[in-house]
Curated annotation (Swiss-Prot):
Keywords: Phosphoprotein. Belongs to the FAM13 family. The modification Phosphoserine is found at residues 130, 258, 405-406. This is Protein FAM13C. Residues 200-217, 282-294 have a biased composition (Low complexity). It comes from Mus musculus (Mouse). The gene is Fam13c. Residues 82-134, 192-238, 268-304, 327-352, 366-485 are annotated as: Disordered. Residues 462-471 have a biased composition (Acidic residues). PANTHER family: FAM13, PROTEIN FAM13C. Residues 98-111, 327-342, 415-446 have a biased composition (Basic and acidic residues).
Length: 601
């Protein structure tokens, strides 16, 4: 056996052929298996003529023969290094150290021994066999080995061997760390499974040594799959360990919450709706459920919401009232709207009050629609029916003795008949539809009511116009004579035919013509007279406006605000006369423009 090994080291051509054969075998793993096996058979016939006899002689060695061979070896650095490589599991690092020392002597052995030891380590051959038999065994196993996994390819290079060793060591450390972390969360059965999965690759390599050389293909896949299995199991354990760890931390469907989040744990504030939109957890789980829970329980708690809104509105009113009282005590007058809005706090109260009233109105309407009864409907109808009653009574008092007021009676009678035909409905939508239907009648009735009171008030206006010193009575003059003067001719005829009060107008006009021209008979004046009145009226307006402006400026200096209606009492006469002059000026301008148009036509 020793002579065979020495022969393998001395024969350079044989060693180089063996090295090239192993290199070709390792590189040609990705090539076609049939071509490689054919080439190997031809090379074996040429280079190893006596391999079969030697394999038969040294097929089954014993442990004692192995020890005898180790004792009879001569003390040689190269041979001892080679035998150490045959025995060890990691020959590449030892060979690298020896090659650094004896680079010139053992350059050839550096190629031969790793390839042989690699083939021997992969095939599981014993260390006492001859190098020729081990080379042949390596060739046979490579030839018959199936391509199961590309990761199990035999790499004879030293650099990649050390990298693979480091990678295996790091994987073993990671597996040990994962098993330590998962031991707190996994059961004893899972722990046993992980320990077996981690420790299985090492015994697999030791137990894969074949007893017979006739069937070398069986142990090789087992040993060859061991690194791949170790890598796969490490990846599986890493993914499974992390997933199980996360599963135990989150506790499945019931995640563990922080103690500071005890308010939200297992409560209805937690949003578990799968149909909800994907949003950040801060807004989805805590902010959104508050509004959703409020909306969900709004049907039963609507009266409470209405009461809360009512209390809020009352508190805002109370605050505003206190501000008004305090303001009045300090400045001796009630605050105006501008005074309230100038204060930002009061402005906020007023805005909140408007919003609260609007929300309260919407809530009441919604509640009435849900309950099927609208308390606002009949109230509105009553409010619409009650105001016309005194007006109709007033009309009957003023226009009661009229025998021929058929147009007004028909228009006033249509509205009550329509109200009787459309009783107050329970649904709020129905009342809106009815109001839209009756709206033209309301508009017509409103226009008639605005026209009817004017004829009865005309005589009193004419009497007051003669005495211009009466300011309180003259305050009604600016608004009343304008519509009368602007009425069409047909309306004047209707009033003269239907109202007996109009019979007094000619006598009053005759009495009014005697002193001077007044508001009632300006339309009878000529163009020069109208122009003179226009100049005089404009001069009076300027004079009064100057006096009133001085009063307002003085008041503003004293109080810092413009005078209100109650502040104008000292200058009530001037204000009344100023309004009267403005109305007279408008009338004169209209009359002059009418006469100019008539002349042009």
């Amino acid at each position: 056996m020793f002579s065979c090994f020495c022969f393998s080291l001395q024969d350079n051509s044989f060693g180089s052929a063996a090295v090239t054969e192993c290199d070709e075998d390792t590189v040609s793993v990705h090539e076609d298996e049939d071509d490689c096996s054919g080439l190997r058979d031809e090379d074996n016939k040429e280079n190893y003529p006596q391999v079969a006899a030697r394999l038969d002689e040294l097929a089954l060695p014993s442990h004692e023969a192995q020890q005898h061979v180790e004792q009879t070896l001569p003390v040689d650095g190269v041979l001892r290094t080679s035998m150490g490589n045959f025995k060890s599991r990691k020959p590449k690092s030892i060979l690298r150290a020896e090659s650094g020392r004896n680079h010139g002597e053992s350059q050839e052995t550096e190629h031969v021994v790793p390839s042989q030891s690699e083939c021997q380590g992969r095939a599981g051959t014993p260390a006492h066999e001859s190098p020729q038999s081990s080379i042949f065994r390596c060739q046979e196993t490579v030839r018959l080995q199936p391509r199961i996994d590309q990761r199990a390819t035999i790499w004879p290079k030293d650099a990649f061997g050390t990298q693979q060793d480091l990678h295996e060591n790091s994987l073993l450390k990671l597996q040990a760390l994962e098993s330590g972390l998962c031991s707190a969360f996994l059961t004893t059965q899972e722990e046993d499974g992980q320990v077996h999965g981690v420790k299985d690759p090492a015994p697999a390599s030791t137990q894969s040594a074949p007893a017979d050389s006739a069937d070398p293909a069986d142990p090789m896949p087992a040993h060859k799959d061991a690194p791949g299995d170790a890598d796969g199991t490490s990846e599986d354990l890493q993914s499974a360990g992390t997933s199980r760890l996360l599963y135990h931390i989150t506790d499945g469907d019931n995640p563990l919450l922080s103690p500071r989040c005890s308010i939200f744990s297992q409560s209805q504030r937690f949003n578990l709706d799968p149909e909800s939109a994907p949003s950040p957890p801060s807004s989805q789980q805590f902010m959104m459920p508050r509004s959703s829970s409020r909306c969900g329980s709004g049907d039963g708690k609507e009266p409470q919401t209405i009461t809360q809104l009512t209390k809020h509105i009352q508190s805002l009113k109370r605050k505003i009232r206190k501000f008004e009282e305090k303001f009045e005590q300090e400045k001796k007058y009630r605050p105006s709207h501008g005074d309230k809005t100038s204060n930002p706090e009061v402005l906020k109260w007023m805005n909140d009050l408007a919003k609260g009233r609007k929300q309260l109105k919407e809530l009441k309407l919604k509640l009435s629609e849900e309950q099927g009864s609208t308390p606002k409907g009949p109230r509105r109808n009553l409010s619409c029916e009650q105001p016309p009653v005194p007006r109709e009574n007033g009309k009957s008092e003023a226009v009661g003795p009229e025998p021929g007021s058929s147009g007004e009676e028909t228009s006033d009678a249509v509205v009550p008949e329509k109200r009787e035909q459309t009783p107050p409905q329970d649904d709020g939508k129905g009342t809106k539809q009815d109001k839209n239907l009756i709206k033209p009648l309301y508009d017509r009735c409103r226009g008639i009511k605005q026209i009817l009171p004017t004829p009865s008030l005309i005589p009193t206006i004419q009497e007051e116009e003669d005495s211009d010193e009466d300011c309180p009575q003259g305050s009604q003059q600016p608004s009343l004579p304008d519509p009368v003067s602007r009425l069409p001719v047909g309306d004047h005829l209707i009033y003269s035919e239907t109202e007996p009060v109009r019979t007094l107008l000619p006598d009053e006009k005759k009495e009014g013509k005697q002193p001077a021209l007044s508001m009632s008979n300006l339309h009878e004046a000529t163009m020069p007279v109208l122009l003179d009145h226009l100049r005089e009226t404009r001069a009076d307006k300027k004079r009064l406006r100057k006096a009133l402006r001085e009063f307002e400026e003085q008041f503003f200096k004293q109080t810092g605000r413009s005078p209100q209606k109650e502040d104008r009492m000292p200058m009530a006469d001037e204000y009344c006369e100023y309004k009267h002059i403005k109305a007279k000026l408008r009338l004169l301008e209209v009359l002059i423009s009418k006469q100019d148009v008539a002349k042009t036509i």
